[in-house]
């Protein structure tokens, strides 16, 4: 999927989503092994279509998607700094590439992504059960965007949104599980990694009157071309339940009952004084 020209990805959207549906049938390892970067298969970097900027962005997107996917990870040496030629067992890796700023940025990205993965249990603690994963959106094939949630054993979660096209998505809305404020905590498009630096910041407020994807509220994001963002809820808003409105019929009925009760009560307690008889004259 990731090696396809972006124009054809919408016709192969199931290639990027299907693995999630059987990810919990066994305990899987997700390998990009030496077999994938040898014998004419190209390095991961050169599997990517487009110019050099798009190749670097695609590698960052792929590795971020891989880290967010359920299952344990395996990457062959050289992937972390975007080795350009195939692996050759007769020679060492092209460490000289690290003198190129773009490859050095790629190495820093791989390092930071690994640390981010280890520091956030939702990405690895429940890897082999549906309890650790939930879809938000998997069917937006026309824009080649997917979004899902990952959970740890305590119920803490991260939201992951992947944009697989070299197209900027402004105000791209997805369902949000809780009302409140969300924040972007990691982006493959950060400037320090060679990206554009587009960020959603730390104040992403929910649209509580815009339900989406089976959730009562939504958030809108700006997605850089060929990028992955990790989002979390930093402040939940407690919804106050409004008291149930009483119908006019019920209110009128209650008023009638009260009036009838008062009338009945008054009729039962009213007393009549006996009339005094006039004294008759004595003979």
Where are these regions (language model features)?
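Aromatic- and carboxylate-lined catalytic core of secreted/periplasmic carbohydrate-active enzymes
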Residues: 98-133, 230
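Acidic/aromatic-lined carbohydrate-recognition and catalytic surfaces
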Residues: 159, 171, 226, 281-283
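C-terminal accessory region downstream of the catalytic core in glycan-modifying enzymes
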Residues: 93, 98-107, 113-115, 173-207
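A generic secondary-structure boundary signal that marks alpha-helix termini
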Residues: 115-118, 122, 191, 226, ...
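Active-site rim elements
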Residues: 45-57, 94-104, 215-220
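Conserved alpha/beta catalytic core and glycan-binding cleft of carbohydrate-active enzymes
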Residues: 1-82, 86, 118-174, 178-189, ...
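C-terminal beta-strand-rich structural cap/linker in extracellular carbohydrate-active enzymes
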Residues: 198-240
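Intrinsically disordered, polybasic Lys/Arg-rich low-complexity tracts
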Residues: 237-283
């Amino acid at each position: 999927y990731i090696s396809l020209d972006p124009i054809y990805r919408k016709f192969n959207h199931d290639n990027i989503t299907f693995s999630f549906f059987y990810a919990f049938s066994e305990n899987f390892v997700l390998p990009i092994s030496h077999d994938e970067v040898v014998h004419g298969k190209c390095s991961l970097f050169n599997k990517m279509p487009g110019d050099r900027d798009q190749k670097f962005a695609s590698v960052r997107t792929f590795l971020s998607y891989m880290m967010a996917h359920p299952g344990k990870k395996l990457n062959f040496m050289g992937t972390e700094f975007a080795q350009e030629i195939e692996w050759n067992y007769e020679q060492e890796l092209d460490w000289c590439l690290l003198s190129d700023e773009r490859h050095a940025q790629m190495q820093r990205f791989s390092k930071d992504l690994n640390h981010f993965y280890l520091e956030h249990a939702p990405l690895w603690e429940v890897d082999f059960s549906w309890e650790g994963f939930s879809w938000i959106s998997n069917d937006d094939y026309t824009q080649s965007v997917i979004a899902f949630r990952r959970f740890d054993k305590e119920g803490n979660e991260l939201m992951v949104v992947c944009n697989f096209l070299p197209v900027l998505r402004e105000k791209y809305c997805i369902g949000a599980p809780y009302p409140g404020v969300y924040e972007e905590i990691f982006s493959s498009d950060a400037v320090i990694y060679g990206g554009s630096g587009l960020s959603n910041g730390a104040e992403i407020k929910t649209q509580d009157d815009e339900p989406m994807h089976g959730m009562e509220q939504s958030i809108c994001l700006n997605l850089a071309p060929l990028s992955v963002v990790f989002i979390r809820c930093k402040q939940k808003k407690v919804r106050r339940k409004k008291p149930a409105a009483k119908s006019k019929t019920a209110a009128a009925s209650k008023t009638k009952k009260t009036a009838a009760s008062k009338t009945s009560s008054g009729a039962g307690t009213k007393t009549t004084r006996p009339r005094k008889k006039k004294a008759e004259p004595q003979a």
